[in-house]
Amino acid sequence: MKRKALAILFLFTALVASAQTYVRKTNLPTVYINTFGNVPITSKETYVYATMHYVDENDAVTAYDSLQIRGRGNSTWGFAKKPYRIKFQDKERLLGADRAKAKSWTLLANAADKSLIRNAVTSLMGEFTSLKFNPAAKFVDFVLNGNYLGNYQISDQMEVRKRRVDVVEQDLPLLDTSDISGGYLLEVDGFMDGNCFTTSTYSVPIRIVYPDDEDIVASQNQYIKKYIADFETVLNSRDYADPDKGYRAWVDSMSLADWYICTELTANIDGFWSTYFYKDQADSLLYWGPLWDYDIAYNNDTRKPGTKTQLMTDYGYGQTKEWINRMWSDPWFAKLINRRYTELLDAGLTDYLYNKIDSLTELLQRSQELNYQKWGINKRVYHEIVLYSSYDQYIADLKTFISEHSEWLKTAFAQKKPAEPTPPFSPGMFYYRIINAKTAKGLDIQGTGVVQYANTEGRLSQDWHIKPVGDYVQIINRDANLALNDPTIGNVGPTVNIGTQLNVVAPDEESPRQLWTLVPQGTAGYYNLLNSYTQHIANLQGGSANDYTSILSYTNDSRNGSSTNRLWYI
């Protein structure tokens, strides 16, 4: 009896729908959905049966006579302009051959994003990088039960499927021989919806998206939980930065770097609160992505203003940032992020984003006008920071943020990069100044004695030619044309017979007293001047700041890298 009643309802709805005229509202496609009996959609859990008509850019109408629709989202479900999830009876290639063939699709309202395009721009950013799976962004006008609801974005459902997250689908049902090493799709989910667990080391809330809640069995649950627990243990270990024993052996570095850079470039304050990552079968690595849920990114939330000059690892929500902050303390990761960010900028990432924004703005011009006739363009929906009177102002604000924040990130990333060791000195055909690290005064001469003197522009006695001689260098004064020399008399050695003032003498490449090694020290660009004959180090006497203080042949020991009297900037 229920089946007969349902069939009658389907027929009645189909007759009502057939009486409608399906035309485009603007230059975009228009989606018409009619629920059976005009039943309202009031739940994120319970589907309502419906029909759909899709009017494409050429005015061709495709009818779908049986699908289901329900609400979706967390905070966004509470907005007046609501997002939806639709599920077809059969798999449909809704967005063409280059996109997924699937039953489930999303209709994003982008209600809190006055530009309407933050999610789409972020997906395009992912395409520019190495990220494999980037959600669709097809903009349409949406009519539900005869009521125009505005501009919407058709996008993929986050699921394991070809042309979505394309990892191996596990056996269903599992067999004794089944490989349960993958695939898995996971989400860091601050809301803890569905099949979730919290990690023990960093307290990260993780939802197992795939295998589905109704399909996953205990062995799969145990496997992926242990895998993540082991990853965290390694990340938190003493050997975490070891390339073989540490976390690097557990992550795909390219997807990790690109996902993280996208999170920072968009300034997504929820980037570590809601994060997708996945593991494939017979693959030991974790992969990051897809990028999802960026409508409050790009400085669009009053709870976290000022993101233009903030790193999300310091400023954003979510426990995953503790993973990334731990990685930042590994010099390898810091170099990876700096190198990859430079590569993306050099490849034209920001210009690419500006061009995509311009194209989308032109595409949405008529649709956004209609959308804001209904919803109002200067009404606060959620936590928007700025309210403007025109759509173009929101677009300009978005582009300005990308321009200024992308530039700021260069410095922010560079500041987190570990200082590089001072490189070996490679002399050129120049005159050099040799400056003491403690006093910032220059190596100079007084008569034939070597002293320090205030660094003075045009003072030729402070200019030195550093001339390669085999494995050593001669250091020849420009004004006197005399070579730096260690005149120590008697027995010599690193700590023997120290304290003689250095002098300058006629250049002689055969004299070991005139041959020096410039020994790199630390990361600040300083060197020791090591004499090849005495094995002594050039040292500022007593650390005095006075002009004409003598430079001595002095102790060569473990303090070479820390005593500023012995350190020189060239």
What annotation goes with each model-predicted range?
Residues S43-E45, G96-R99, R118-N119, Y152-I154, ...:
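Short, solvent-exposed loop/turn and secondary-structure capping segments
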Residues K87-R93, A102, L107-A111, L131-P135, ...:
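Internal "kinase-insert"/substrate-recognition segments embedded within catalytic cores
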Residues T51-A109:
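Conserved oxyanion/phosphate-binding beta-strand-loop segments in alpha/beta enzyme cores
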Residues Q20-N58:
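N-terminal module-boundary/linker segments of secreted carbohydrate-active enzymes
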Residues M1-Q20:
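Bacterial Sec-dependent N-terminal signal peptides
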Residues T129-D141, N268:
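Short, well-structured beta-strand/strand-turn elements
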Residues T422-I570:
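Lectin-like carbohydrate-binding module/patch detector with strong preference for beta-trefoil
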Residues L28-P29, V39-I41, A63-L67, S75, ...:
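Middle-to-C-terminal accessory/interaction subdomains
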